[in-house]
């Protein structure tokens, strides 16, 4: 809740500055989500729907995404002004693109910890991370949790998956 409040205060403050300097013309902002419109997107969609951004002098357009990596690429290319993406994907972009001068940066954390998870049916017998050894897992290649799985596996002594 505090994160939401800080986000709104920041947006309203920026909006006040933008509207004062632009003679009350709405400042256009293209915002790229990491994924489709779903629960976590409400943080960005609700202020648009309620007119909060517009009241602050911001004309915000929020577009659905196709993964954190894509959101970061679009912000880095200048196609979007801002975006929402997984921190692991942002770190990966920085590591793989040292030549890019204006790399996207994280300005706010939404989650206290990654919302990634491994799900299995009870009948699978998987009850702890080590039980994943030798199993097959499925996740999209662009998924932030999948990209971070190697670190999780190493920290939890999980064998080949």
Where are the language model's segments positioned?
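Short, glycine-/small- and polar/acidic-enriched structural segments
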Residues: 27-160
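Absolute protein N-terminus
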Residues: 1, 25-26
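Cleavable N-terminal signal peptides
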Residues: 13, 23-24
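N-terminal export leaders
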Residues: 3-8
């Amino acid at each position: 809740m505090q994160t939401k409040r800080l986000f709104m205060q920041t947006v309203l403050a920026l909006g006040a500055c933008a509207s004062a300097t632009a003679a009350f013309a709405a400042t256009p902002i293209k915002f790229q989500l990491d994924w489709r419109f779903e629960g976590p997107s409400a943080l960005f969609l609700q202020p648009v729907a309620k007119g909060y951004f517009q009241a602050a002098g911001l004309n915000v357009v929020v577009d659905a995404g196709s993964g954190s990596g894509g959101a970061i690429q679009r912000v880095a290319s200048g196609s979007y002004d801002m975006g929402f993406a997984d921190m692991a994907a942002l770190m990966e972009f920085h590591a793989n693109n040292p030549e890019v001068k204006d790399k996207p940066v994280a300005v706010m954390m939404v989650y206290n910890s990654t919302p990634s998870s491994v799900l299995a049916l009870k009948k699978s017998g998987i009850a702890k991370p080590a039980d994943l050894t030798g199993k097959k897992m499925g996740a999209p290649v662009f998924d932030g949790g999948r990209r971070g799985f190697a670190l999780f596996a190493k920290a939890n002594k999980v064998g080949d998956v």
